[in-house]
UniProtKB/Swiss-Prot annotation:
HAMAP family: Pept_M48_protease_HtpX. PANTHER family: PROTEASE HTPX. Binds 1 zinc ion per subunit. It is found in: Cell inner membrane. It comes from Citrobacter koseri (strain ATCC BAA-895 / CDC 4225-83 / SGSC4696). This is Protease HtpX.
Amino acid sequence: MMRIALFLLTNLAVMVVFGLVLSLTGIQSSSVQGLLIMALLFGFGGSFISLLMSKWMALKSVGGEVIEQPRNERERWLMNTVATQARQAGIAMPQVAIYHAPDINAFATGARRDASLVAVSTGLLQNMSPDEAEAVIAHEISHIANGDMVTMTLIQGVVNTFVIFISRIIAQIAAGFLGGNRDEGESSNGNPMIYFAVAMVLELVFGILASIITMWFSRHREFHADAGSAKLVGREKMIAALQRLKTSYEPQEANSMMAFCINGKSKSLSELFMTHPPLDKRIEALRSGEYLK
């Protein structure tokens, strides 16, 4: 319910800002070109802003603390492991953070391969063997090396553009048909209240449907990150890490679309809306070598 409320508030803010932008630029919202410009502006703009803020948002959402200087042997091991794997993957050393949570989890985020972040939970460090922890870290390093954050940003931008554009095209047609009064010189948008209501409802519906697309891409990238981990540290270590995840608590995920966690929440209406494939499918993919080719 909270996510739906935030979605509606966000769209309300977008429409208000959109109106101001159109007033300042002189773009006619009733034209297809104007709608397309707006959809591209806000569809990709929101995604790239989220990407640029992803490290800050992710750290704030889990209360993570970036390690500036290792304070103990555990932090020293973590920093050395990340540094070694980053060199192997051919990326710059990411920032490394730890956050307090009982579940076994980790995530990677950041706008660029050379300005990324890897964060791990205290539950992971306490409950996983060094080999298993290495595999999880390698999974996150692979997300960075594969450019998954930018890939998902572009996908989200395309999806957002489609949702905004199609919603407003249909809303214009509905408002003109249901509330337009050309004899009185009313605008081609028709009744503005009908336009607003229809646009909001359609954005919600299309947004939910479009999330199926983004979730499919997210699951696809998880398989590739598992394969990347297997290449860095060995297939058996990654399989052992995934088997260990089966025993973990419900994971605390970073509150950012561009944060890639190792262990996605399992409760979902359908696998279509899951960010991560089921653990058994990930283990089977590693054993079959499907994504290692």
